[in-house]
């Protein structure tokens, strides 16, 4: 899932065809459901990546503290105060952390998309009300 793809998809979904207001109003529920599914899928993926991050942190902590399994351990010794910096800069942990941050951006975007779909429903209602007013009803 890419942010650019989600942006393009939202751009198409928020468009209101003023010649089909009844259809657009009915379709709004389906659009909200679609984006809610995307939101929950992204949240689920973030939980999986958070678990991966914990495993990676534990493995790298064991590596740097010399408690690693077998022959894999760091010859460098770090103080406890240095360990936090060393772990956060480790390439394995950094890769997982970057992935988690990217999925966080996707989650924020989907949350905004849900708000946009809600606003779309209100906009459709206002257009219908304005047309009724203009027709003298």
Swiss-Prot record:
Annotated keywords: DNA recombination, DNA synthesis, DNA-binding
InterPro entries in alphabetical order: UvsY (IPR021289)
Intrachain disulfide bonds: none
Protein's GO biological process: DNA biosynthetic process; DNA recombination
Record GO terms (molecular function): DNA binding
Any Pfam family: UvsY
Stated role: Plays a role in viral DNA synthesis by promoting enzymatic activities of UvsX recombinase, by promoting UvsX-ssDNA filament assembly, and by helping UvsX to displace bound gp32 from ssDNA.
Subunit-level organization: Homohexamer. Interacts with gp32.
Name of protein: Recombination protein uvsY
Organism from which the protein derives: Enterobacteria phage T4
Gene behind the chain: uvsY
